[in-house]
Structure formats: C-alpha cells, structure tokens
Amino acid sequence: MDLINEKLNNLENNATKSPKEAVILLNMGGPNSLYEVGVFLKNMFDDPFILTIKNNFMRKMVGKMIVNSRIEKSKKIYEKLGGKSPLTPITFALTERLNKLDPSRFYTYAMRYTPPYASMVLQDLALKEVESLVFFSMYPQYSSTTTLSSFNDAFNALKSLETFRPKVRVIERFYASKKLNKIILNTILNTLNNRKSQDFVLIFSVHGLPKSVIDAGDTYQQECEHHVSLLKELMQQKNTPFKEVLLSYQSKLGPMKWLEPSTEELIEKHRKSHIIIYPLAFTIDNSETLYELDMQYRLMAERLAVKEYLVCPCLNDSIEFAQFIIERVKNLKE
C-alpha cells in the first residue's frame, strides 16, 4: 500500500511540476527526407513574405515554375548532406539540452516550411494546458522574409485554436547581445585553432535578399551591418585583429538586383589571402552553411588557390548557445 501511495504522490508531483510556459524556437525548416524537398520548396515559394507577388494565383504560378526549375538540383544538394537537412535534428538536440538545463519551461520548435509546423506544435501545447508562450525567432537579425513570416504563421495557427488563449511574448532579434557576440567570437577563434587571426580575412556571410525588399523598408541589411560593427568593437576590446573584417551576401536567386557584395565576389577578391567565413545570419547549420559555404565555395576557393579556407560552424546545440537562449527568455520583459 505504501508503494502505491508513493507512486501516486510521484504522479501528483510530476503533474504539479509540469511547465506552464513553453518556448517555441521558430525557424525555416528543411527537408527531413528527399521526398520532402518538393514540400519545402513549394511552401517556401508560396510564402507571400518570400515571393512578394500580391496576386495569389500569379504567386502560385511563379512559385510552381521556380520549384520545377530547382527541385532536382536541390535534391542533389541534400543527397550530399545525407538525404536530409541537418536543421531539424540539430534543433531537436538543442531543445533536448534546453529542457535539461531549464526544466521550469518546456522548449520545443516549429518550422515554417516543413514539419513540425506551428499548427501541429500549438495543438500539442494546448493539450498540455500551457498558460504562456514565448515565440523565439532563431534568426539573429530581423527580416520580413524570415522573422515576420514565422511570427505571422505562428500567430495565425494560434488564432485558429479557439479554446487556446495563452499569454504570448516574442523574441524577434538578438544580434546586439554582447553575450551572443562573445560566443560567436569564441567560435571563430576555435575554428582558427591557434592560427594567427591577423593572417585571415574574416567574412561574415549572411543570406542575401533582393534589393527591392530593403527598399520597401526591411531592416535586415541595416541590422547585419550593425551586427558586424558590434563584433568589430568586441574584437578590438579582446585584442583580436584580423587582416580585414567584411560583410557579404550569399544565395542569390533569379535575375533581380540583390544585396552586394556577394560572398563569391569577396572570396575571389581576396584569393591571395587566408579566408575564414562565419555564417552570421544563421544559428543552426543548414544547406546554405554546410553545402554552399563549406562545399561549393570551398571548391571555388581551391580553384582560385586561396591559401587557406575555413568555415565556422553555427551555434547549433552548443551548451553556450542553450544557456544564452535560457537567459534571454528569463530576462524577457512582461
């Protein structure tokens, strides 16, 4: 009888300890299999924040054309990455670490273009009777194409659940955090692995955007430039000089004018130097970091006879990044 009572008490204690606040890490997602490559591309190019064509019919038509032109090439990219994007499993590992470090909250994640979608995650949290939510954008800098798209999707999904009305707070950018930037600098130094920083051109490569998006008022370029300036200040404080510190834009798509300079241009321009790349706009490794930066541009660097070409990993599921997320959530104002 005592054993039964003990088990009942344990169940009651566990129920009492069940977190009433959930933190949802919001990101773009990536194919979880080669089959999902089509799903990923279709959802991305049907997003009005990505393909800013106001007419729904025209957007779907143009999006379908883009998907058809890119799907086979994209599948080959993901084949080189093991048949899927690393973004989802790394994010899962990050939430596992977060839940161990901070059991007072429940950490989970939702993706914009592949499962688990925000609607699925929120339905699960409604069943858990969560009372408050934090939508945490995994993009350090704000952009309508990433942050706003994810928030819009999450809030629409929440609105559709008529009986679930938790308190909601958001973290929409965090690039200005000194703690974050110290972690980034340490990642760069770890990648250098005792090489002399002053021998290297440091390129902060970020995802590119069409110039028209910036002209329409998106603050992304401004925030990326500010982020680099903050990191330069930190490098001066830490007496960590580089030959040059530059900002570049990658992943151009289509004939329209995009933000410049491109990462390829800077690699070619500094072909006679040692180069180290840090993916400043991403916190979790994905095809743009592991394929584009670490494979495609590495081959380019080899053809150009670049003296040395290094690519830093993203923050991923590191304990330092997990601790940063927890601190950011705890310090979030009501």
From Swiss-Prot:
The GO molecular function terms of this record are: ferrochelatase activity; metal ion binding
Main location per the UniProt record: cytoplasm
Report the record's Gene Ontology biological process terms: heme biosynthetic process
Q: Decide whether keyword Oxidoreductase is in the record.
A: no
Catalytic activity reported: heme b + 2 H(+) = protoporphyrin IX + Fe(2+)
Query: Pathway of this protein?
Result: Porphyrin-containing compound metabolism; protoheme biosynthesis; protoheme from protoporphyrin-IX: step 1/1
Superkingdom field = Bacteria
Q: What class of enzyme is it?
A: lyase
Which Pfam family, an example, fits this chain? Ferrochelatase
The positions annotated for binding Fe cation are H207, E288
According to its UniProt record, the EC number is: 4.98.1.1
**One GO CC annotation:** cytoplasm
Which compartment or compartments is the protein found in?
A: Cytoplasm
Keyword flag Cell membrane: no
What are the protein's UniProt keywords?
Cytoplasm, Heme biosynthesis, Iron, Lyase, Metal-binding, Porphyrin biosynthesis
Q: Which HAMAP family match?
A: Ferrochelatase
Functional description taken from the UniProt entry: Catalyzes the ferrous insertion into protoporphyrin IX.
Give the family, as the similarity comment puts it: Belongs to the ferrochelatase family.
Q: By what name is this protein known?
A: Ferrochelatase
